[in-house]
Amino acid sequence: MEEFKRNLELDRSQQHDFIYPLIFQEYIYALAHDRGLNRSIFLEDTGYDNKSSLLIVKRLITHLITQMYQQNHFLFSGNDSNQNKFLGYNTNFYSQMIFEGFAVVVEIPFYLRLLSFLEGKERVKSHNLRSIHSIFPFLEDKFSHLVYVLDILISHPIHLEILVQTLRYWVKDASSLHLLRFFLHEYPIWNSLITPKKSSFSFSIRNQRFFLFLYNFNVWEYESIFVFLRNQSSHLRSISSETFLERISFYRKIELEVFTKDFKAILWVFKEPFLHYVRYRGKAILASKGTFLLMNKWKYYLVNFWQCYFYMWSQPRRININQLSNHSLDFLGYLSTVRLKPLMVRSQMIENSFLIENASKKFDTLMPITPMIGSLSKAKFCNVLGHPMSKPVWAALSDSDIIERFGRIYRNLSHYYSGSLKKMSLYRIKYILRLSCARTLARKHKSTVRAFLKRLGVGLLEEFFTEEEQVFYLTFAKASSNSGELYRRRVWYLDIICINDLANYE
């Protein structure tokens, strides 16, 4: 135990109070501005302007700090409108610039830790480098052998103060955290991190990166404790638990609460060896070979864990127990199922022959066409029935830019859903995007689609939409090598770095 305390103090000594001065550096907001311009093509322009003055941002920060220390807190109008002005400037726009700058500054300590990993100062383990590339092969390889799955909607913090308190143990700069807390409380448009949306929650488009950073950091905190409890049999010697021991408050909670006389009675549920956990954004799945009783215990453990340790209100209905054999798992834009595939084998014994029926489990990944059409409709590529429409916003672009944008969207979707065994849904998406592209070009040239395609040639669009880049991909070897099997084989492209915008329909 003394060794872990020394490691904890060593990590604390490596923290530096350097973040606060960076808030006043113009290049920080230049980085935030440039990063804001590199957005998804589906997002409309939110007001970034090359003529925006970084000096105005610095003046706003200086004024806010003055108000904070004078305890003379000004109030903004609750109307979330671009007409809201402060000191003669667009408050919403410049507040967005300030928070984007904060996102750049706060990420610096974690980026430095990543560099120390890459430089070999600390050991790099594969479980610290997991990405979306590893999720799809994991599902295909492991899920067919599992029985039950917990479909989890991760709870959100009740208040932003919880996120700031969690961040405090890593960022040892009290001044910058006080300023961050002041911003979060003074801006009404930032007072709520999450906005209700049906049965789940979603982040506002505005300043999504900064709030996602706070949210993901909070999720990482409780996942580190979750991993520690999962590996409790190693008595704190597990490499995957070292990051957990770098914390202060939760270290004390382990010492006072976990290591008690009821230690084994409380944690016996973690003995399950075939337990798999995957998370992406606000959803997670916990799959196991265990019984329904075991999964039910995990469910209520997670609810109590979030409420007692992180003060996050969680309801049992946000965690559903499903049996993989009769349930479709909605995860990462795929509908995944594990179905029994019957197999008849004829056996011959001298004069008698008989049939033996065997059933093997097969993991299927399907592209949900209805939600995808809904996403295309929301992006104005088609109507709610799937009939293609023109994209008037892009009509001012050049012909090559219009074709390139439509083609890039299709290639991204084609790569993302390459793991689906049934490709008919992709063909329908291709039809919608091709005709939407043709109608956009015809609208630009004030012509009909038929006349424009006759003049341009259908082959040009067809060739562009089928053009493939040189991208590494991953397949699983199969025993059969006939053409039908090759056509239906899953192909996992390694250029997927995040879930596609149109696939994120929730």
From Swiss-Prot:
Gene Ontology, cellular component aspect: chloroplast
A Pfam family this chain is assigned to: MatK_N
Record localization: Plastid, Chloroplast
Entry keyword RNA-binding: yes
Keyword Metal-binding among record annotations: no
GO process annotations (BP): mRNA processing; RNA splicing; tRNA processing
Species assigned in the record: Rhododendron tsusiophyllum (Rhododendron)
GO molecular function, one term: RNA binding
Membership in a protein family: Belongs to the intron maturase 2 family. MatK subfamily.
Name of the molecule in the record: Maturase K
The entry's keywords: Chloroplast, mRNA processing, Plastid, RNA-binding, tRNA processing
Function as written in the Swiss-Prot or TrEMBL entry: Usually encoded in the trnK tRNA gene intron. Probably assists in splicing its own and other chloroplast group II introns.
